[in-house]
From Swiss-Prot:
Swiss-Prot/TrEMBL GO biological process terms: fat cell differentiation; innate immune response; proteasome-mediated ubiquitin-dependent protein catabolic process; protein K48-linked ubiquitination; protein ubiquitination; regulation of TOR signaling; SCF-dependent proteasomal ubiquitin-dependent protein catabolic process
Keywords in alphabetical order: Cytoplasm, Phosphoprotein, TPR repeat, Ubl conjugation pathway
Known function: Substrate recognition component of a SCF (SKP1-CUL1-F-box protein) E3 ubiquitin-protein ligase complex which mediates the ubiquitination and subsequent proteasomal degradation of target proteins and plays a role in several biological processes such as cell cycle, cell proliferation, or maintenance of chromosome stability. Ubiquitinates mTORC1-bound TTI1 and TELO2 when they are phosphorylated by CK2 following growth factor deprivation, leading to their degradation. In contrast, does not mediate ubiquitination of TTI1 and TELO2 when they are part of the mTORC2 complex.
Organism: Rattus norvegicus
Region of interest: Disordered: 1-25
Bias type Basic and acidic residues, positions: 7-25
Gene: Fbxo9
Annotated SUPFAM superfamilies: F-box domain, MIT domain
Residues bearing the modification Phosphoserine: 124
Chain ranges of the F-box domain: 173-224
GO CC terms: cytoplasm; SCF ubiquitin ligase complex
Recorded metabolic or biological pathway in which this protein acts: Protein modification; protein ubiquitination
First-listed, main subcellular location of the protein, grouped into a coarse class: cytoplasm
Protein name in the entry: F-box only protein 9
Length: 435
């Protein structure tokens, strides 16, 4: 015991004499001295835990405990302050004061970056607290009815600038998150394009929460509805949003083509022996392609879809038998949506034949042929608005010399099979103009 006291005393004297040691070495020596003092105290016979500790050990331990307690109180105070600021931001956002909410959100996240995950909202019967009127259940987060509002609360605010997304990995290149909101919305309008490719917009919303919010922008869906229905959709009633109107209201689809296949059997010529007569199975297809600007194309041909569908991407097709025109949507009192179209054959300017210009020829009575088509729009299976049923087909012949019009109506029989929609990816592979 005497040797241990001499070692402790000599170490203390040596530490006091060597004032030129670094701060790290001095801290290490102080910890060693405290440990040895406590060890000596425990080895002293007759001294229990109730006895008074030596002054160096008691002072060192009290200083460490005090520092830890002070640090813990500071962390609790900081978290409590961040909690109050975050709840205040939620309250301001619910009241419509978005700028004030942004300010409180930013201050709260500067204190505690993950404060949103440390808050548990409760509702008390008398509830007079700031967050008493809000409920959050992390276990039932997937059952939230308004996912858009939830994502808006999860946005990250930095230096008063709304950041829709953050890079997952560090990169030296410029990330899309640095773009302002206006530029991002313009990019989203290019994604939708003039072809109304809202399917790509929905896929884009799966990237992150910020893109989800941009994809739910009411202006994009309002412009899409105006392009489809025009002035007949000036009121939202009975729909709650423009997006719901576009998804639920009956409309023709633009990202593909409606196709029908008709098959019939006709009798062939009789053979020479008189005992055999050929029968022919005839197959032909009808194709109808709609465009958002009100144009429509129709083609009847025996060629199969793989060879015809690529030609119908634009109206500038070189197919001779194509019929071009305009269409409109009509909703009757029975809540059935019908499509009416007037189509005509593409006009071709024939060059003048100067070979027979001196011969008298019998004038041919020129006439214009217009076809009037009526279709009923309905859904079948799991797809919406993917079926067109024939309800009217007629040919209007207008003679240019007299101006008279002759109408020939066709009977809608089994030869007019329904047309079913087939989506074509190449139709929306690239954009020509923004929405």
């Amino acid at each position: 015991m005497a040797e241990a006291e001499e070692d402790c005393h000599s170490d203390a004297v040596r530490v006091g004499d060597e004032g030129h040691e670094s701060p790290a070495e001095r801290d290490l020596q102080a910890q060693l001295q405290m440990f040895r003092a406590q060890w000596m105290f425990e080895l002293t016979p007759g001294v229990g835990s109730s006895n008074v500790e030596s002054r160096p050990c008691r002072a060192g331990r009290s200083s460490i405990l005090k520092a830890a307690a002070d640090k813990g109180r500071q962390e609790l105070a900081k978290e409590e302050k961040a909690r109050e600021l975050f709840l205040k931001a939620v309250e301001e956002e619910q009241n419509g004061a978005l700028y004030e909410a942004i300010k409180f959100y930013r201050r709260a996240m500067q204190l505690v970056p993950d404060i949103e995950f440390k808050i548990t909202y409760t509702r008390s019967p008398d509830g007079d607290g700031v967050g008493s009127s809000y409920i959050e259940d992390n276990e039932d987060a997937s059952k939230m009815a308004d996912l858009l509002s939830y994502f808006q609360q999860q946005l990250t605010f930095q230096e008063s600038v709304l950041k829709l997304c953050q890079p997952e990995l560090e990169t030296s290149q410029t990330h899309i998150s640095v773009l302002p909101m206006e530029v991002l919305m313009y990019i989203f309008r290019w994604v939708v394009s003039s072809d109304l490719d809202l399917r790509s917009l929905e896929q884009l919303s799966l990237v992150c929460r910020g893109f989800y919010i941009c994809a739910r922008d009411p202006e994009i869906w309002r412009l899409a509805c105006l392009k489809v229905w025009g002035r007949s959709c000036m009121k939202l009633v009975p729909f709650s949003s423009w997006r719901e109107m576009f998804l639920e209201r009956p409309r023709v689809r633009f990202d593909g083509v409606y196709i029908s296949k008709t098959t019939y059997i006709r009798q062939g010529e009789q053979s020479l022996d008189g005992f055999y007569r050929a029968w022919h199975q005839v197959e032909y297809y009808r194709y109808i392609r709609f465009f958002p600007d009100g144009h429509v194309m129709m083609l009847t041909t025996p060629e199969e879809p793989p060879s015809i569908v690529p030609r119908l991407r634009t109206r500038n097709t070189r197919t001779d038998a194509i019929l071009l025109g305009h269409y409109r949507l009509s909703q009757d009192a029975d809540n059935q949506t019908k499509v009416f179209a007037v189509i005509t054959k593409k006009k071709e300017e024939k060059p003048l034949d100067h070979k027979y210009r001196y011969f008298r020829r019998v004038p041919v009575q020129e006439a214009d042929h217009n076809f009037h088509v009526g279709l009923q729009l309905c859904s079948s299976g799991h797809q919406r608005f993917n079926k067109l049923i024939w309800i009217h087909h007629s040919c209007h012949i207008t003679y240019r010399s007299t101006g008279e019009t002759a109408v020939s109506a066709f009977d809608i029989d089994k030869m007019y099979t329904p047309l079913f929609f087939a989506r074509v990816r190449s139709y929306t592979a690239f954009s020509e103009r923004p929405l």
